[in-house]
């Protein structure tokens, strides 16, 4: 396991390894918050630790975890300056979420909405909302998140069900899910409109 980080400049160029800070772990999630900062959280052997990242890309030491320790969650920004972690697994799959304030403080568990799952993707869309989607091993449903951090019930999945996908915003108000694993690695992508509709 590693705790290295790699900075990416505004041209998309990835820099060399930066010596790790905090607990080395895998299967964690990360999102931006506070307009210009980021947070890593959860992962490893069922951890709830977080690590804040300042607006220079410097990763801070571990912050004692809040909420259910788990691995395989997803995270996204919402509401322009906040973030949300959601889903994951311990011995079984989970559906709770944890909101992150504009100052990087993680709140306690919020009762889960939608299908419990892990190893899914999440991204911001629409300027101030978020979407969770897909999940281990062949799930394809999505859950929209309002600009106040409320997660909606399952939306019937579109596209290939898969786990271990990634997601990101693009174009200022849209999102994209890509890649994943169904039993073998796949390279499909699914675009998300600025109203949260997932395309085939």
Residue ranges of model-derived segments:
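Polar, enzyme-active/binding microenvironments
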Residues: 1-200
